[in-house]
Amino acid sequence: MFIGLRLRIQVDEDNLQSITQQLLSHLAGPDSVAAVPTAVHSLSQHAQSPHGVQTSSGLAGIRAYRLTLAQRILSICSRDTYTNVTDFEWYLSVLVDLAYVASVNVGLQIRDQLVDIVGRVKAARRYAVKLMVKLLNDDTFLLNASDEGSCAEVLWAAAWICGEYCGWDPSSL
């Protein structure tokens, strides 16, 4: 079972990435569905620092590390057709947040999961449309869409979801 454990270890920069990779391997599969949000939150926190900003972990600016974090979040939650996800509105929010903070090329995976979830989970469609409308109306996201690692591919998913399910929330379109 995943147990939230905070350790403070003093290490040099050479060992930090190795230790972090070992910790990530333990998060590969939380033992209970209830532990998934905690694990995803923990991974998301590490991915949230902006490009080039040194963080307490020292690794958020390393592209390979950020890619590993993003892929781990996507893998944990999508495993066995989303059996680890009990709240799809929460996971849709996680996917959109990840599109904003990843700064690595995971846009295709996020796009595919957004479309897949909305197609499978009728109860999440209204929320998805609202979320996608916000994304499409975000000028900053749109202006940065040409940047490497911008996850601009999610804009396709947002447009498709809004078009396909526009009747779910016509007031926001």
Where is each model-derived feature located?
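Extended alpha-solenoid helical-repeat scaffolds
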Residues: 1-173
